Amino acid sequence: MNVLEVKNLTKSYKKHIPVLNDFSISIPAGRIVGLLGPNGCGKSTLIKLISGLLQPDSGEILVDGNEIGEKTKAIISYLPERTYFNSWMKIEELVNYFEEFYADFDKTRALTLLHDLGIEPKAKLKSLSKGTKEKVQLILVMSRKAKLYLLDEPIAGVDPAAREYILSSIVSTYNPEASIIITTHLISDVEQVLDDFVFLSFGGEILMSGNAEEARNENGKSLDMLFREVFRC
C-alpha cells in the first residue's frame, strides 16, 4: 500500500485561479521525496491539504489508506514553513508538551539531537536565533514515529554547517516504513538524501518526476542543474 495517494486534486484561492489543478501523485513507503518548484507553484498548499489544514475543492487524498481526518492526523508529522511555538516557552517544555500530546514521540531521540547540535533544553525560544528555532522545530517533528513526514522548507533558515547534520539525521533515524515529503528551493543541499523528486510548476503541473539517482545517471547532471534547465533559471 502506498503511504500517500493524491487523486485529481484541485484547489483554488482568489479569483478561482487554481493553485493545484487535477493534481495526482502516489508515494510508497520508505521513500524520501523532494517536491521542488518556484514560489507560488502550490508546494505549501499541497502540504497543507495533506495535513488537513486546508480543504480541497475536489479530488481525493488518502494517507495509509485513510481519508484526511483524525486517523491521518495521528500518523502525519508536519513541519510548517514558519515557526509556530510561543516564544516564552523553554525548549524542555516543548519537548514535554510533544511527549504528552503525541503517543509516538521519542523524547530520548529529541534530547539527543538537541545535545548533538549544542542546543540547551532550558533555553527559552525568544533567546534563540531564527535558525536555531527552526532546528528545534525540525527536531521535535522528526522525533515522532510517524508514517508520513511533511517538511515545508525544513532547512531554509538553518546555517549551512548544520544542514548536512540535520539531513543525515533525517535519513538515518526515521522509520523505514514511513515516507518523507520535503519542499525546498535549496535543491543542491537536499538532493543527496532524495529517493524521488517532483518538479512542480504553476497550477500544480508536474514538469518532471522520477527516481533521483536514475535522473542523474540518464542526464549526466545533478537535480539542481536539471531544475535550472527545466525552469530556465
Feature-to-residue mapping (PLM):
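Helix N-cap at the start of a conserved alpha-helix in ABC-type nucleotide-binding domains
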Residues: 160-162
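Walker A (P-loop) phosphate-binding loop of ABC-type ATPase nucleotide-binding domains
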Residues: 38-42
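Catalytic Walker B motif of ABC-type/P-loop ATPase nucleotide-binding domains
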Residues: 149-153
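H-loop (His-switch) and adjacent beta-strand-loop-beta switch element
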Residues: 197-211
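A short, flexible loop at the N-terminus of ABC-type nucleotide-binding domains that lies
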Residues: 1-6, 10-22, 29
